[in-house]
Amino acid sequence: MNAIQKEKAVVLLSGGLDSATAMAIAKDMGFQVYALSFSYGQRHTTELEAAKRVAKTLGAVEHQVANIDLTCFGGSALTADLDVPKGRAPEDMEKEIPVTYVPARNTIFLSFALAWAEVLETSHIFIGVNAVDYSGYPDCRPEYIQAFTAMANLATKAGVEGRTKIEIHTPLIDLTKAQIIQKGIALGVDYGLTHSCYDPSPEGLACGQCDSCLLRKKGFAEAGIPDPTKYIP
C-alpha cells in the first residue's frame, strides 16, 4: 500500500487537458483529491462546466470554485475585450508572452491553493503546468515553481513552525502534450469531458484556431489518439 495513500492534496483544476491529467496522476499516487477551480471573469467559462465534470468523474472529495474578478484589471484577452490570437505556428507561440497571458494568474491560483492546503493540513499541491509545449507563459516554468515553493514555506504557519514542508507537484512540467495525453489515457482520463479553447462559441464549441486549441490538436495527432474535442465546423 502506498505510504501516502490517505494524504490529502489540493489540485488546481481548470477543466482543461493538463489539469485533468494532473488530477488523475494525484489520484493514482494515492492522494485524496480536493479540486480547486476559479471563476475569475474569463471569457471561456465553458471550462468551469468541464472542471465540474472532471472533478466528479475522477472522484474529488470536494470541489471548490472560488469567485474572483480579474476583469477589474484586464490586461489579457481572456479577461478584457482583446482579440484572441488565432492560427499561430508553435514556433511563434514561443517568441513572446502572448496577450492570452493573465497577469499573475498562477501566482493568484497557487496562493488560494496554499491557503486551502493549510486549512486541510496538507503540504501537497498539484498544478498541471507544462514547460515543453506551452504558449510562452512565465508562470509555467520550473524556476517559477521553485520560487513559489520557497515563498510558500516562508509564508505559512506550518512552514515557519517546521511541521511540514509545502510541496508543489508539477508532474507534467517536462512532458510534451502528446506524452501528457498518453499518460492520461493510461490513467483512464476521458478527454471528451475537458475543455481547452480560449474563445469558444456560445454553444461551447472549441474554435480550433487559438493557441490552446492548436496545441491540443497537435498533441492528439502526435500521440496517435483521436481528438474527442467538438470544434466549430
UniProtKB/Swiss-Prot annotation:
| EC assignment | 6.3.4.20
Q: Keyword check for rRNA-binding, yes or no.
A: no
Cofactor(s) needed, names only, are: Zn(2+)
Pathway annotation: Purine metabolism; 7-cyano-7-deazaguanine biosynthesis
What does this gene product do? Catalyzes the ATP-dependent conversion of 7-carboxy-7-deazaguanine (CDG) to 7-cyano-7-deazaguanine (preQ(0)).
Family of this protein: Belongs to the QueC family.
Q: Write down what this protein is called.
A: 7-cyano-7-deazaguanine synthase
- State the taxonomy lineage: Bacteria, Pseudomonadati, Thermodesulfobacteriota, Desulfobacteria, Desulfobacterales
